[in-house]
Amino acid sequence: MSQNTGKKSLVFHLIFWLGSVCLLLLDQWTKYLACIHLKDRIPVSVIEDVFCLQYLENRGAAFGILQGQKVFFVLITLLFLFLVFWIYHCLPADRRFYPVYVTMMLLLSGAVGNFIDRIFRNYVVDFFYFELINFPIFNVADIYVTCGAALFFIVFIFVYKEEDVNEMGRLLFPWKRKDKNGK
């Protein structure tokens, strides 16, 4: 079992935060391009009848559910961001926890990317559309959230052992009572 190794190095902070900012900037840049090149235009076919770029102003969540619930999404996003910052603060820069940090970078960048849209546009710009399966239109931030969530489940199901998860629990919730065995 590893111990909390103390402060994260400057390099660690730079990799995490610059990585997150780069992902966020990529998301915002693609949305900017979608607004300029796709808005009020016919969809652009990338692969005929399979995949196209189609502008959509999504005022809901994934798949367009919960339309017009901006306050709800803002509050949920703020709560989620608090959780990410808490995890970042509590977990050590231990190599074993790097997959958690990568997951957090993806989830943070995706959540903030769509949060920015909701705050400044009152909708989220979506533009990727898989026609072949009529999949709901999505964006780069949605890809980050999906990949981050998938990585989270893969890591916690196939990589981490019970001891690792228990140690993370102790690091994240230090006020939690110990059981009768002192664990």
Feature names for model-found ranges:
Residues 1-183:
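Alpha-helical transmembrane bundles and membrane-interface segments of multipass inner-membrane proteins
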